[in-house]
From Swiss-Prot:
Enzyme class: transferase
CDD domains: TMPK
Annotated function: Phosphorylation of dTMP to form dTDP in both de novo and salvage pathways of dTTP synthesis.
Gene3D superfamilies, per the entry: P-loop containing nucleotide triphosphate hydrolases
Annotated organism of origin: Burkholderia lata (strain ATCC 17760 / DSM 23089 / LMG 22485 / NCIMB 9086 / R18194 / 383)
Amino acids binding ATP: G11, I12, D13, G14, A15, G16, K17, T18
GO molecular function: ATP binding; dTMP kinase activity
GO cellular component: cytosol
GO annotation terms (biological process): dTDP biosynthetic process; dTTP biosynthetic process; dUDP biosynthetic process
Keywords for this protein: ATP-binding, Kinase, Nucleotide biosynthesis, Nucleotide-binding, Transferase
Sequence similarity: Belongs to the thymidylate kinase family.
UniProt-recorded name of the protein: Thymidylate kinase
């Protein structure tokens, strides 16, 4: 644990990743405390003043598909420049609720935006930069839908159909298959204690 690392939490809406993120970060901070390092917790879209304004627009206003993708990457560039890159340069660890995998899954898999367009934006905004670890909370869309149904008023993504989330999930799993060294897949259908046991194994490997 000598240098800063970048960890992302991913999954379709209703997978439960955000529920477990704070717990994971508290445990990670306990491991890092002796080395004098901090855990920076952030999210996408968001994480900066501009990013949070874009988040409000992206989650609630209908827009052209390509406009949506461009705004996602604009928020990401600001996030990298102001939060992620400075924290890693200090030697701190960053844990983000979503990153670029979400854009490929939602705008690519879910909405059908061609992958080559997203790859072009990815190269422009972040070069070859990728998370050191991506924790993917995997759950069937029907299960996630039941969980979302009991939550607050849904945003425009949470209101999407099971078919949309099936495509989104498939893209997440495709990316995990292409980069098994980077992904840790969590069975998010399990109970909270069982999921935390899975996360303990992830923490132990860091």
């Amino acid at each position: 644990m000598a240098s800063g690392k970048f960890i992302t939490f991913e999954g379709i809406d209703g997978a439960g990743k955000t529920t477990h993120l704070q717990w994971f970060c508290e445990r990670l901070q306990g491991k890092l405390a002796a080395a004098g390092r901090q855990v920076v917790v952030t999210r996408e879209p968001g994480g900066t003043q501009l990013g949070e304004k874009l988040r409000e627009i992206l989650l609630n206003q209908p827009m052209d598909l390509e406009t949506e993708a461009l705004l996602m990457f604009a928020a990401r560039r600001e996030h990298l420049a102001l939060v992620i890159e400075p924290a890693l340069a200090r030697g701190d660890w960053v844990v983000s609720d979503r990153f670029t995998d979400a854009t490929f899954a939602y705008q690519g898999g879910g909405r059908g935006l061609p992958r080559d367009k997203l790859e072009t934006l990815e190269r422009w905004v972040q070069g070859g930069f990728q998370p050191d670890l991506t924790v993917l909370f995997d759950v069937a869309p029907q299960v996630a839908s039941e969980r979302r149904g009991a939550a607050r008023m849904p945003d425009k993504f949470e209101s999407e159909s099971d078919a949309f989330f099936s495509r989104t999930r498939s893209e997440y799993l495709r990316r995990a298959e292409e980069a098994p060294h980077r992904f840790a897949i969590v069975d998010a259908t399990q109970t909270i204690p069982e999921i935390r046991h899975q996360l303990e194994r992830v923490l132990a490997a860091l």
